[in-house]
Amino acid sequence: MERLENCAQMFQRRFLNESFRRHCPVLLACIVLGGSLLKELCPLPDSYWNNKRNVLNVYFVKFSWGWTLWLLLPFIALTNYKLTRSTTKVLRRLSSLLVSTLIWYLCTNLFLYIENITGSCYESEAMSDPKEHQDRRECRLHSGYWHGFDISGHCFLLSYCILLILEETSIISNIRFERHWHRMAINAQFAALSILVIIWVWMFLCTAVYFHNIFQKVIGTAFGILAWYITYRWWYLQPISPGLPPASASRSGKEPIYRN
């Protein structure tokens, strides 16, 4: 258990610290711009990481929202309850995950709609021999290749998940442990979320240097950062909202939601 605590403390000091949280949106913007320029000006040779069958893409990125939701839900519930001792306030904070899920659903469907209305169906990736299929789904059902404006869903979702986890884990520095099982459970969840952030940042970098064009990646990343900003930097500061994590509320100058 001591190793688990040391691991959580190491992640808190070196990765999920205040400086990284504050500069992460700028870092993500730099990664997507720098990676896109590298792809255009000096493409990297094929590697394991631009193979869509790589293990992180197959088992993590394809289910990135599920992983993020699955790990954040118990973490938010335990940490917020420990600070507030209020089931109502915990449920209020958990409603932020419903908001985030709605944002994920609307944005991904918007991206698919844009790709659908801007695309055409072809026999192959060389875009030869147009086929008479009117939407992406029908085209692929008939073994065609749909070419449209494909906003990077990976850039959107990975950037959004990274910023979401950083906001919600900021609460860790406010917690004082009284029971051993509290420390063990919360440290294990924090360590798992820290590892998830590292995976998301790495795969975001791989997307930037290997896939899509610069406009598709920049727009996807902009949606992710904007979704975070509108919720955590504006709406969640308002009285009628899921509210911020207690640590974030204190930093923003608002009254923390766990105070009576």
Swiss-Prot record:
Active site: H154, H212
GO biological process: cytoskeleton organization; fatty-acyl-CoA catabolic process; lipid droplet formation; lipid homeostasis; regulation of cell morphogenesis
Pfam families in alphabetical order: FIT
GO function term, MF aspect, one: triglyceride binding
InterPro entries tied to this protein: FIT (IPR019388), FITM1/2 (IPR046401)
Membrane-spanning ranges: 24-44, 58-78, 94-114, 146-166, 190-210, 211-231
Regions of this protein lying in the Lumenal compartment: 45-57, 115-145
Reaction(s) catalysed by this chain's protein: an acyl-CoA + H2O = an acyl-4'-phosphopantetheine + adenosine 3',5'-bisphosphate + 2 H(+)
Compartment(s) of residence: Endoplasmic reticulum membrane
Any one GO cellular component localisation term in the record: endoplasmic reticulum membrane
Endoplasmic reticulum as UniProt keyword: yes
Main location: endoplasmic reticulum
Cytoplasmic face residues: 1-23, 79-93, 167-189, 232-260
Membrane-topology descriptor: Multi-pass membrane protein
EC numbers, comma separated: 3.6.1.-
Keywords of this entry: Endoplasmic reticulum, Hydrolase, Lipid metabolism, Membrane, Transmembrane, Transmembrane helix
Family affiliation: Belongs to the FIT family. FIT2 subfamily.
Protein's job: Fatty acyl-coenzyme A (CoA) diphosphatase that hydrolyzes fatty acyl-CoA to yield acyl-4'-phosphopantetheine and adenosine 3',5'-bisphosphate. Preferentially hydrolyzes unsaturated long-chain acyl-CoA substrates in the endoplasmic reticulum (ER) lumen. This catalytic activity is required for maintaining ER structure and for lipid droplets (LDs) biogenesis, which are lipid storage organelles involved in maintaining lipid and energy homeostasis. May directly bind to diacylglycerol (DAGs) and triacylglycerol, which is also important for LD biogenesis.
UniProt xrefs under PANTHER family: ACYL-COENZYME A DIPHOSPHATASE FITM2
Protein name listed in UniProt: Acyl-coenzyme A diphosphatase FITM2
Gene: fitm2
